Regions:
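Double-stranded beta-helix
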Residues: 132-197
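A short beta-loop-beta micro-motif enriched in histidine and acidic residues
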Residues: 109-122, 175-176, 182, 205
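Short, solvent-exposed loop/turn segments at secondary-structure junctions
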Residues: 19-21, 95-96, 114, 130-134, ...
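Non-heme Fe(II)-dependent double-stranded beta-helix
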Residues: 2-9, 16-116
Length: 283
């Protein structure tokens, strides 16, 4: 399949029409229903969510997230990637940048694989519910092949799965920078070694995506399962790594503003009963 070749050569791929138009509309409706279900979600989003990325408010376990994760076409792509029908999924968050929010872009290009990890370890991605030409995903083509070289050059050896890339290094590879045109219903996947970031751009576009990542179940230990099941029942949001699990905190950085503290007792529980059978298979 062409997307496998793209991932190997470019470090990323775009697969159009993974969700049907109907599935996109269902997901959008679910997202907006959740977003408007509690006033603090909307009021605090741009204050506590860097680059529009939701990490709080139990976002990783809302209906739109689980609906997308359990779509057969989404699963089929990752089954093909990992050559197995047995997968586990991350409890990752979403990104929402409304079209009326305009910000100056900063360079925060990074890789999500630690210097201590060599070779292909994880594919991460998102399903887009909006079409975006400029308020979108930025990637450096082929940079997954530079990850180990960069870490050796900078003498980096730590095991944190978040690696900020120096601006001077990015300038050397600027010709490989790609600003992706992503259509609604598309699945974007990248090797976790690939250098990437979001950008606001200059066009007033809504951007809504659900981050998504699967790993083979065969490497999930019983201890990992216990931890994952615990975080599922507690509706905790995690990083894009399905394992080892890295859970996000419950509260954002408030800088002394108590109004930003989240009252989880006021959140509306997601309705997942019709998806439960498929969800359990992915934990």
């Amino acid at each position: 399949m062409s997307f496998l070749k793209d991932l190997e050569e470019k470090g990323y791929c775009i697969i159009d029409n993974v969700l049907s138009q109907e599935e996109v509309e269902i997901s959008l409706n679910s997202f907006h229903e959740w977003f408007n279900s509690y006033s603090q979600i909307k009021e605090s989003h741009n204050k506590v969510s860097p680059h529009g990325i939701f990490k709080f408010f139990e976002v990783g376990h809302q209906r739109h997230a689980w609906f997308i994760r359990t779509r057969p076409a989404v699963l089929d792509v990752f089954k093909e990637l990992w050559k197995t029908d047995e997968l586990v999924v991350s409890f990752d968050g979403s990104c929402y940048i409304p079209k009326d929010l305009m910000k100056k872009d900063n360079i925060w290009t990074h890789a999500d694989q630690a210097p201590s990890k060599k070779g292909l370890m994880c594919y991460q991605g998102f399903v887009s519910l909006t079409e975006n030409k400029e308020r979108t995903f930025v990637v450096y083509e082929g940079s997954h092949k530079l990850h180990e070289i960069y870490c050796e050059e900078k003498k980096l050896t730590d095991n944190k799965n978040w690696l900020l890339i120096d601006h001077d290094y990015l300038d050397k590879i600027k010709d490989t920078k790609r600003v992706l045109h992503v259509k609604a219903g598309s699945l974007v996947i990248w090797d976790s070694r690939t250098f990437h970031q979001n950008q606001y751009g200059t066009l007033p576009e809504d951007r809504i995506v659900q981050y998504i990542s699967f790993l083979p179940k065969k490497q999930r230990t019983s201890k990992m399962f216990e931890k994952r099941f615990k975080y599922f029942t507690e509706k905790r949001t995690t990083s894009h790594w399905a394992y080892p699990v890295k859970v996000n905190g419950l509260q954002p950085q408030t800088y002394g503003n108590k109004d930003l503290l989240i009252d989880y007792s006021k959140l509306v529980p997601p309705k997942l009963d019709d998806l439960k059978e498929d969800i359990i298979k992915l934990i």
